[in-house]
């Protein structure tokens, strides 16, 4: 019995397939327009429910009108990429039509599409046409429409009642048009809208209450609109919003007030905005936020203290490909217990503090590769056995500094270096090297530094005044983060401002030159070299740093001394803790230019030069030399008298005796003559060539040469 039931079921299945095949064949042969494809295809409703639909596919046929012999059973009509600009009544008999695709055609007006009486239509594609406006009630017959794609057109005007009748609309794509305003009245007719994409429109700005009628909206995309600011009440009414994108705008700060009005937000995209810093309160009390993206921000330099605060459900933070992001405060995260993934790769970070990582109890993975990492005490935690955090792409983690470790893998270096304290280093790009401000404006200079122990930050003004957090001044104010505020700047405030970061190990500095209305009053020189003593064969030079801009324990990373005249040029590296230098083995009565160049760890350089002429050799003889010379002259005089008498006595001697006498006199005179100065004082380079071939040849290379002058300097 079971066998017969199985055979009967199989027979019925074959019969059903045969009938379907015959039906499809009949549809294709008798009711399918020429060149089109007519068949039953899978179809998904706007709610992603699977169905099968009778589909007529006439895409890419260069049609100028809709085929006339369409079956009334057609449910999906695809006419994409044709040249249709107008319909007559070809659609009026398609009572079962649920999806219509007119994308990439030549419509300029919605009325010309012929949408009357399409009461079953749920999805309409009109993207990439030439539509310029949407008039009142232009879609009122589409009472069941759930998806409207009208993006990538030329729409500049939408009337207040253009969407009237679309009470069931769930998805609206208006992006990439020419809209200059967003009118909240548009949305009065779409109370059930869940997804709105309106980016890439040249809107003048977002207004307060712009989206208030959209209480059911779940996703809002405001990308590529050149927005510079989001008003505090712009997002009021979006109580169901879960996903928000401000991608590729011109926001210079996080719209924290507006974000507080979307209590259920889960996904926030702020990527590709010129936000300068993420500061305290920017992301605070966003209780449902799960993922945050702050990638590709060309101006982002720092994530400050408590920038992310009380985000109990945040699980993923992406802050990658920010070319200036060089500083994350050790207390950047507060009450972020659920964070599992922290992506910080491809930035300008020199380090991430251990305390930052320890504040994230559920952190599972971190990505800090492709950063110019500073391999010293700040990142020793990376090699700690106490952490179970997985490092993404660890083989791409290389040291950028100190110089002796550059290019080596981080973990290999940290095994060798176990120091617990290290010098401060001011983060690169936190403020520019030069500014030109308008008179009366307020200036903010953000200085950030990393070190162990944590450095103190203060600023020094062009007049040498030290500005600290405790300083009381109407002109200057310093935040605990290191941001100097200069109120209502005037021309007399122009000049050199120096940030100093200092701890027990030493200090680091960075300078910004500020012009006001193009004027710079400050002429102070950071580094000054001067001649302390001049002799015929040596010069003693000294230098000092302007006390207005440097601290006494500032350490340079390198220093170079160069001496130059038209005949010789020599360069030597100077120990960085030296403030005096004795240049020896010089030529008398010769002009020289002596230059000192110093560089800090940021490769910022300061240079100072001085011109000097060595003394004449006659003034350089000491007393012992004079006594020796006098004695030598007396001996030579006596000998000369004896030789003169002998010459008269043997005048009549034989020629060979006269010859021998002449030879003896010549030999004696060679022993007693003065040595030329250019032999007594050979060029500086010869002093360190020792017994080399150059000594034998008696020649000097006049090309600039790197030499060791460790024997000729004096310690301060």
UniProtKB/Swiss-Prot annotation:
All residue ranges annotated as the Fibronectin type-III domain in the record: 525-617
Positions with biased composition (Polar residues): 702-716
Signal peptide start-end: 1-25
Disulphide bonds in the chain: 447-499
Main localisation: membrane
Any one GO biological process: positive regulation of synapse assembly
Location in the cell: Membrane
Domain (Ig-like C2-type): residue spans on this chain: 424-515
Glycan attachment residues as annotated in the record: 69, 96, 106, 117, 385, 517, 582, 611
Domain LRRCT positions: 371-424
Chain positions of LRR repeats: 73-95, 96-117, 120-141, 144-165, 168-189, 192-213, 216-237, 240-261, 264-285
Domain LRRNT positions: 26-72
One Pfam family of this chain: LRR_8
Regions of compositional bias (Basic and acidic residues) in chain numbering: 691-700
Region (Disordered) residue spans: 691-716
SUPFAM superfamilies: Fibronectin type III, Immunoglobulin, L domain-like
Residues on Cytoplasmic side: 653-716
Record SMART domains: IG, IGc2, LRR_SD22, LRR_TYP, LRRCT
Topology feature Extracellular, residues: 26-631
Residue intervals passing through the bilayer: 632-652
InterPro entries reported for this sequence: Cys-rich_flank_reg_C (IPR000483), Dev_Immune_Receptor (IPR050328), FN3_dom (IPR003961), FN3_sf (IPR036116), Ig-like_dom (IPR007110), Ig-like_dom_sf (IPR036179), Ig-like_fold (IPR013783), Ig_I-set (IPR013098)
A GO cellular-component term linked to this record: extracellular space
PROSITE patterns: FN3, IG_LIKE, LRR
Keyword annotations of the record: Disulfide bond, Glycoprotein, Immunoglobulin domain, Leucine-rich repeat, Membrane, Repeat, Signal, Transmembrane, Transmembrane helix
Membrane topology, as annotated: Single-pass type I membrane protein
Protein name: Leucine-rich repeat neuronal protein 1
Species of provenance: Bos taurus (Bovine)
């Amino acid at each position: 019995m079971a066998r017969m039931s199985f055979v009967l079921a199989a027979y019925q299945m074959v019969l059903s397939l045969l009938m379907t095949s015959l039906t499809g064949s009949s549809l294709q042969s008798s009711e399918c327009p020429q060149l089109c494809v007519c068949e039953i295809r899978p179809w998904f409703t706007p709610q992603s429910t699977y169905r099968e639909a009778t589909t007529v596919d006439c895409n890419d046929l260069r049609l100028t009108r809709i085929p006339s012999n369409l079956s009334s059973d057609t449910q999906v009509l695809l006419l994409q990429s044709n040249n249709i600009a107008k319909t007559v009544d070809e659609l009026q008999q398609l009572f079962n039509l649920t999806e219509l695709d007119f994308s990439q055609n030549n419509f300029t007006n919605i009325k010309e599409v012929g949408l009357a009486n399409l009461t079953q239509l749920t999805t309409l594609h009109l993207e990439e046409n030439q539509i310029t406006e949407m008039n009142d009630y232009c879609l009122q017959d589409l009472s069941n429409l759930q998806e409207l794609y009208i993006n990538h057109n030329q729409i500049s005007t939408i009337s207040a009642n253009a969407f009237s009748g679309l009470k069931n609309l769930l998805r609206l794509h208006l992006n990439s048009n020419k809209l200059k305003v967003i009118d909240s009245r548009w949305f009065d007719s779409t109370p059930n809208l869940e997804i709105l994409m309106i980016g890439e429109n040249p809107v003048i700005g977002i207004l307060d209450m712009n989206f208030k009628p959209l209480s059911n909206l779940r996703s809002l995309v405001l990308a590529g609109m050149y927005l510079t600011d989001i008003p505090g009440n712009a997002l009021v009414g979006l109580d169901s919003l879960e996903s928000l994108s401000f991608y590729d705008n011109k926001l210079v700060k996080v719209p924290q007030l507006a974000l507080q009005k979307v209590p259920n937000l889960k996904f926030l995209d702020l990527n590709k905005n010129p936000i300068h810093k993420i500061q305290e309160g920017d992301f605070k009390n966003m209780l449902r936020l799960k993922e945050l993206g702050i990638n590709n921000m060309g101006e982002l330099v720092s994530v400050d203290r408590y920038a992310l605060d009380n985000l109990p459900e945040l699980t993923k933070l992406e802050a990658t490909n920010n070319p200036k992001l060089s500083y994350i405060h050790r207390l950047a995260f507060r009450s972020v217990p659920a964070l599992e993934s922290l992506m910080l790769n491809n930035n300008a970070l020199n380090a991430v503090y251990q305390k930052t990582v320890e504040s994230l109890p559920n952190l599972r993975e971190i990505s800090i590769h492709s950063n110019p990492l500073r391999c010293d005490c700040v990142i020793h935690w990376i090699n700690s056995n106490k952490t179970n955090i997985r490092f993404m792409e660890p083989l791409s983690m290389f040291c950028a500094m100190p110089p002796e470790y550059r290019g080596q893998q981080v973990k290999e270096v940290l095994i060798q270096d176990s120091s617990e304290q290290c010098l401060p280093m001011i983060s690169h790009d936190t403020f520019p090297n030069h500014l030109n401000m308008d008179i009366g404006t307020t200036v903010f200079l953000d200085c950030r530094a990393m070190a162990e122990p944590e450095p103190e930050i203060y600023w020094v003004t062009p007049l040498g005044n030290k500005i600290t957090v405790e300083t009381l001044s109407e002109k200057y104010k310093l935040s605990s983060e290191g941001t100097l505020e200069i109120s209502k700047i005037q021309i007399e405030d122009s000049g050199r401002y120096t940030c100093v970061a200092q701890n027990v190990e030493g200090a680091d500095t960075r300078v910004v030159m500020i012009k006001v209305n193009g004027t710079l009053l400050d002429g102070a020189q950071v580094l000054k070299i001067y001649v302390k003593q001049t002799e015929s064969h040596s010069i003693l030079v000294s230098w000092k740093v302007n006390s207005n801009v440097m601290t006494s324990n500032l350490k340079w990373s390198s220093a170079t001394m160069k001496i130059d005249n038209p005949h010789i040029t020599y360069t030597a590296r100077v120990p960085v803790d030296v403030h005096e230098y004795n240049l020896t083995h010089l030529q008398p009565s010769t002009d020289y230019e002596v230059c000192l160049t110093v560089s800090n760890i940021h490769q910022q350089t300061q240079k100072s030069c001085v011109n000097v002429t060595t003394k004449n050799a006659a003034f350089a003889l000491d007393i012992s030399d004079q006594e020796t010379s006098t004695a030598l002259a007396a001996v030579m005089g006596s000998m000369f008298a004896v030789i003169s008498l002998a010459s008269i006595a043997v005048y009549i001697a034989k020629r060979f005796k006269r010859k021998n006498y002449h030879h003896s006199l010549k030999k004696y005179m060679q022993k007693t003559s003065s040595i030329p100065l250019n032999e007594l004082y050979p060029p500086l380079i010869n002093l360190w060539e020792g017994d080399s071939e150059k000594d034998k040849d008696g020649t000097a290379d006049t090309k600039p040469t790197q030499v060791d002058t460790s024997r000729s300097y004096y310690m301060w």
